[in-house]
Amino acid sequence: MILPINTYSDPVLTAKAKPLKGVDSSIRELIADMFDSMYKAPGIGLAAPQVGHSLRLLVVDISTIKEYADYKPMVVINPRIVSVAGRNAMEEGCLSVPGVAGDVVRPSKITLHYRDEKFEEHTEEFSDMMARVLQHEIDHLDGTLFVDRMEKRDRRKVQKTLDAIKQGRVKTSYPIAPHAPKIAVEA
């Protein structure tokens, strides 16, 4: 099932997601729905908070990028970055921040401890694009969006688009969750 994507300023995107204690049929269904939703958008990574579930769960598939065609889709549960190395800047975008792109500096290599869809533990090293996508998605689990990591001058350039998203004035080729703008209350 295709799930609607929550967009910029939705509270679920700024909350710290809760760890999973295991994988049952409802989590397996959510994982399948997340892959379907990611491919429909199309995207290369999707975190559970982006589809309204405050859980430490994400899916990644960078094989649609020509130079990464050999990579397999990946399910990551309860990730924890245990070490980082190098740094580089690269343009990022996000399904939850449609129409916005900007450079973000991140470590170019990470060692990640996580559980897979069978809840089996792994510790692996990732570099380049895969390291970047994983860090971007893990940020979602920690309540951080890529625009929060952009240089201030770059963020100012996209502020009008961010304001439009915040007000629910955004069009996408994929379904987005209903957006209820905050209403000012007079004291």
UniProtKB/Swiss-Prot annotation:
Cofactor: Fe(2+)
Keyword annotations of the record: Hydrolase, Iron, Metal-binding, Protein biosynthesis
Keyword flag Cell wall biogenesis/degradation: no
Residues that bind Fe cation: C94, H136, H140
Catalytic activity from the UniProt record: N-terminal N-formyl-L-methionyl-[peptide] + H2O = N-terminal L-methionyl-[peptide] + formate
CDD domains per record: Pep_deformylase
GO molecular function: metal ion binding; peptide deformylase activity
GO biological process: co-translational protein modification; translation
Enzyme Commission number(s) of this protein: 3.5.1.88
Keyword Lipoprotein: no
Name of the top EC class for this enzyme: hydrolase
Family indicated by similarity: Belongs to the polypeptide deformylase family.
Primary role: Removes the formyl group from the N-terminal Met of newly synthesized proteins. Requires at least a dipeptide for an efficient rate of reaction. N-terminal L-methionine is a prerequisite for activity but the enzyme has broad specificity at other positions.
Protein name, per record: Peptide deformylase
Organism: Chlorobaculum parvum (strain DSM 263 / NCIMB 8327)
Lineage, uppermost ranks: Bacteria, Pseudomonadati, Chlorobiota, Chlorobiia, Chlorobiales
